[in-house]
From Swiss-Prot:
This is 18 kDa seed maturation protein. It holds the Pfam family LEA_1. GO terms for molecular function: disaccharide binding; oligosaccharide binding; phosphatidylcholine binding. It comes from the Eukaryota. Residues 70-79 have a biased composition (Polar residues). Residues 1-12, 25-68 have a biased composition (Basic and acidic residues). Residues 1-173 are annotated as: Disordered. GO terms for biological process: embryo development ending in seed dormancy.
């Protein structure tokens, strides 16, 4: 029975990954077409360069969204298959303690707090840092937001997504 569940979760993960890749491909194509249109109508070389930069930013965001969806799909598969291995009387608490395979610190290595932000055990325990306005996403020039270790970090503006978009949701009805 467990083998069938694992196979089903793998198929589901593969299907949602294909959907995420297709969506990213469409976003990249849209960015390229929009860039070409803007370059054709622009007379100033600066405007043409700006159109190219906008295209590259959109393409990078599409790739980041695809990678985030893949990570989400992998985590969902692991969560579903792990839940099947638990016997009666066992449960997870979601306390956030133990070994983490993901970052448990906020920007620049600051702890993010002890509030669980996901219903799935082991999926982060952080809160946003700084002032947060509901429904507003901050804007940062690409490559200037440096995270721990000097690596560039990205913000997935589509986290959670729309229920009917590819790569998101539980797969149920």
């Amino acid at each position: 029975m467990q083998g069938g569940k694992k196979a089903g979760e793998s198929i589901k993960e593969t299907a949602t990954n294909i959907g995420a890749s297709a969506k990213a491909g469409m976003e990249k194509t849209k960015a390229t077409v929009q860039e070409k249109a803007e370059r054709m109508t622009a007379r100033d070389p600066v405007q043409k360069e700006l159109a190219t930069q906008k295209k590259e930013a959109k393409m990078n965001q599409a790739e980041l969204d695809k990678q985030a969806a893949r990570q989400h799909n992998t985590a969902a598969k692991q969560s579903a298959t792990t839940a099947g291995h638990m016997g009666h009387g066992h449960h997870t608490t979601g306390t956030g303690t133990g070994t983490a395979t993901y970052s448990t610190t906020g920007e620049y290595g600051q702890p993010m707090g002890a509030h669980q932000t996901s219903a799935m055990p082991g999926h982060g325990t952080g809160q946003p840092t700084g002032h947060v306005t509901e429904g507003v996403v901050g804007s940062h020039p690409i490559g200037t937001n440096r995270g721990p270790g000097g690596t560039a970090t990205a913000h997935n503006t589509r986290a959670g997504g729309k229920p009917n978009d590819y790569g998101y949701g539980t797969g149920g009805t």
